Structures are given as C-alpha cells and as structure tokens.
C-alpha cells in the first residue's frame, strides 16, 4: 500500500506565452498565471489479487489551445479549477507459457467545460506466448494487444505550433484496436 501527494506551480510552456510567426493569426504575447497542480494518489499492489490505483488531480489556471472565433488556433487560460478522478485496476498473470496482462481505467474530469476532454473508459489487454528458444539465447513473445477507449472529443493537432488543441466537434473512439506483435 502506498500513497503520494504532489503539489506544483509552473509557468505554461513557451508556446502559450510568446509566439512569433509571419502568419498574422499566429502572433501573441501573453502574461498567463502559473498552472497549479495538486495530485493525490493511493496505490494497492497485490500479486495474489490485482493492483488498484486511485488518483485525484486538481488543476487551476490550465493553459490550452483552441480555435478562436476566426478559426485560428490560439492560447487561452481557464481560471477555475478542473478536477480529475481516475480509478485503475490491473492484473498480470500467466498459465504455463501464456501471459495475460489486463488493465482497465475509469476517469472523469469535472468542471472542465469542454477544455480538458478525456475518455471515461480505457482498457489495455495483451494475451501472448513467451518462451526461451535456441538454448535460451533468444526469448520470444508473440501475441495480441487489444485497446479500447470510449468516445470522446480527442484533441486535434496544429502542425504550425507543433501543439495539440481542444476541439469539441468530432468524437473519436468507441471501437477496439487490435495489434499482433512479435518481440524477440
């Protein structure tokens, strides 16, 4: 059983405060307040049952990019607090040379007002075979990895800024992603 408290205050990164470009819409100089984070987490680890992690995050003065009224991506700062709660359960076990690695996470951001969008449900699952080969000169892992996240407004990317920005027009997710892998 373990607990942790983390408190920080830091300036938004440089792209939020100063950006100069030959594009008229991409020039700004801002005097944003420090972003203040308070994070509390509890973690329970058990080889017999499962691992459990609880996180509570409180963010004040979050800096973010989004499109303005003229559809240009600009920096903004949200002066209220945003609260994020995460609950993660994970379990890894094996049967002979077959391995199962499973994780599920529920998360919710409150008072985010469309500024911090997160999927409510995330799962990551791997099923694979692992064994030594060639007189233990090689360890082989091969199997499938399946990931899923619930539909949400995923951030878009602005290549001029090299930054992600908030968008609230198209939801993404709600379907599984499967990969086959071989590690040697």
Predicted regions and their residues:
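Exposed, low-structure sequence patches enriched in small/polar residues
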Residues: 1-184
